[in-house]
Amino acid sequence: MPKKLKFGKIDLKDKFFDTLREDYPGFDKWFIKKYDDEAYITINSNNGMLLSFLFLKGEGRDEDYSNIQPILPPKKRLKVGTFKVINNGFRLGERFLKIIFDNALKNKVDEIYVTIFDKREEQCRLISLLEQWGFVFWGMKGEERVYVRDFHPNMNIDNLRSTYPFVSIRQNVYIVPIYPDYHTELLPDSILNTESPEEFVEDFPHRNGIGKVYVSRAIEPHPKPGDILVFYRTGGYHKSVVTTIGVVEELRYDFQDENDFIKYCRKGSVFPENKLREMWQYSIEKPFVVKFLYLYSFPHRINMKTLIDLKVLAGVNDAPRGFKPITNEQLKTIINETKSDDSFIIY
């Protein structure tokens, strides 16, 4: 899991920084000057070496952009100052994009931008990732490429990643059950107070990725792309809680065979391969897969009893078994009662 640390607590001698030194003359001096500033990092739990580093900086409308061509017009921006991820197959880049978007929301910026070289494979891979999530090439800052991402509330159903994390309240909304055994494994940011963060330290692709996979055999109704999912961790009258909001990116029914199904699910699903095979072989009626983007974890969890009191659920027997439709008003009730920051929702 990423940690937020002051520069002064990060080992500048780590080999991780060698390429940054090569690319930026004076990197060490800049780093030491930032002693009290904070950066986001992840560390390899086996050897203590750095795997990723991210430094963010807020900029006002009066910022001088004369060293960027064409010059950026005045806006409130979030600058992705230093961003490096070692490719280890665990989707750390996506994990850090989530941090970037969360900071952009919190600071109510108009735009995010990043300056990046395209000399190395890891940089080209990062550029490709940024482009997948809506960053577009703007111009140059010396030899560095500049990419910008508009951050005004907007939702493009045909390409949800390009307008992530914004979602419209006018979409259909479903409550979806998820068993306790799988809940925090798939949605680690929604960890319960009763669970130990130490159990979720290791890197797995399904934990880090914004894009995740939910395998289902539920009868209709089924959601469609752009619909909102509210995840409900099962556990009975007092212990069942709504924890998380996601948005449906894609539904897939038409797998050629078992291996096609496994390949599609592998990186975004909490299930190991043998469990996925078991699910496929269980019945002649094959499962379908909902690919969704994780949006937000509720700061305050409300349980089944409260959902019944609020008339979101009609009673104990109304607990979601498949995709349970709720109204937009009921979603607003959940957002209010969970004390959520709703700045990612377009009303």
Label every model-predicted segment:
Residues 103, 109, 115, 124-193, ...:
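Contiguous surface segments at macromolecular interaction interfaces
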Residues 219-235:
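Short coil-to-beta transition motif at edge beta-strands of beta-rich domains
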Residues 240-252:
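Short beta-strand-centered aromatic/proline hotspots
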